[in-house]
Amino acid sequence: MTQDASPILTSLLDTDAYKLHMQQAVFHHYRHITVAAEFRCRSDELLGVYADEIRHQVTLMGQLALTSDEFIYLSSLPFFQDDYLHWLRDFRFKPEQVSVAVHDGKLDIRIAGLWCEVIMWEVPLLAVISEIVHRRRSTQVTTDQAVQQLRTKLEQFNALSADIDITHFKLMDFGTRRRFSREIQHTVVSTLKDEFPYLVGTSNYDLARTLALAPVGTQAHEWFQAHQQISPTLANSQRVALQVWLDEYPNQLGIALTDCITMDAFLRDFDLAFANRYQGLRHDSGDPIEWGEKAIAHYEKLGIDPMKKVLVFSDNLDLEKALFLYRHFYQRIKLVFGIGTRLTCDIPDVKPLNIVIKLVECNDKPVAKLSDSPGKTICQDPAFVDQLRKAFALPLVKKAS
């Protein structure tokens, strides 16, 4: 049936921190909202051949549960409330929510159900798909190869950064969803902890717990997408999403993602009150220099000192790109760099997968991610894209997947 019948995932916390942070907010505010999400491979790879193995792993995910040690760990953090953690202790994945099909050799996956349940599938399922594909395609890869590649990149980074003050550089591991394997992510992050003094945390809650690192992450595109159908007024949906997040987390987790409906539309909603209360902004599409300049100009226009705010860059970064951005901005605003695939699937002769799972419906109605990169735009309903464009005064969208 499968090449390896054992479960790839062994911890419910082997996921991105922002999934739990968003899940708690959904649990408290939108417990009865339903959603649907779909898998996309942004390249033309035919991944349908792996469908049976993926189905098997989805079934095994139904056995995952929060352990007593994990419950105690989450309880020790400042983010979570008791009612949510007791609910999470009883949470189980429902494999029947996941439909895996093959069309013309391409992998089709759709996940549907209550948002507070569906929200947990995306990251671990992508990690499962990535590991299944890579262990079939790259059977000879070892953790030593990954560590050697990492050390080479760290040596290059140290050489390239020798001429500037690098003490304010901050790196976060964002590598769960497209990692080569769970083992390699653990080894890479553990090596970074020991050998790279600028590592400040990981988005993976399991690694944060086992390696004693800070867990990092706030909200994803789906938080803003769902509000397109939750908010009574579409044009106000982004502001509602920003406000409800503050209602849930008034004094923490204050980094806002800006590109669900483009940076320009975001900044029109990000007024003085929001800009004061949010700690900073995250970049995930479009030109990072242009984006950062817009963010700094916006803070300055509002009379806010940019050096009191943080920009988080997380779009297809490697250490060299991060250093380029650091050089440009570090004397003007605080910076953090989230690097994913280029840490946890950076192995010679291994091609990382360009795969995502994104929200497509909320309460049986369409939602969209328009993004600052046309190739990252996702929506099934052109008419709804037109509605969004009009509501947020956007230019014509060039391409939707």
From Swiss-Prot:
InterPro entries in the cross-refs: N/Namide_PRibTrfase, NAPRTase_N, Nic_PRibTrfase, Nic_PRibTrfase-Fam, Nicotinate_pribotase-like_C
EC number(s) on file: 6.3.4.21
GO MF, any single term: nicotinate phosphoribosyltransferase activity
Any one GO BP annotation for this protein: NAD biosynthetic process via the salvage pathway
Phosphohistidine: residues bearing it: H221
Post-translational modification: Transiently phosphorylated on a His residue during the reaction cycle. Phosphorylation strongly increases the affinity for substrates and increases the rate of nicotinate D-ribonucleotide production. Dephosphorylation regenerates the low-affinity form of the enzyme, leading to product release.
Domain of life: Bacteria
Residue runs in coiled coils: none
Reaction(s) this enzyme catalyzes, per UniProt: nicotinate + 5-phospho-alpha-D-ribose 1-diphosphate + ATP + H2O = nicotinate beta-D-ribonucleotide + ADP + phosphate + diphosphate
Transmembrane parts of this sequence: none
A Pfam family of this chain: NAPRTase_N
Example of a GO cellular component annotation carried by this entry: cytosol
This protein's pathway: Cofactor biosynthesis; NAD(+) biosynthesis; nicotinate D-ribonucleotide from nicotinate: step 1/1
Keywords: Ligase, Phosphoprotein, Pyridine nucleotide biosynthesis
CDD domains linked: PncB_like
Signal peptide from the UniProt entry: none
Family as reported in the entry's similarity comment: Belongs to the NAPRTase family.
Stated role: Catalyzes the synthesis of beta-nicotinate D-ribonucleotide from nicotinate and 5-phospho-D-ribose 1-phosphate at the expense of ATP.
Protein name per Swiss-Prot or TrEMBL: Nicotinate phosphoribosyltransferase
Source species: Yersinia pestis
Gene: pncB
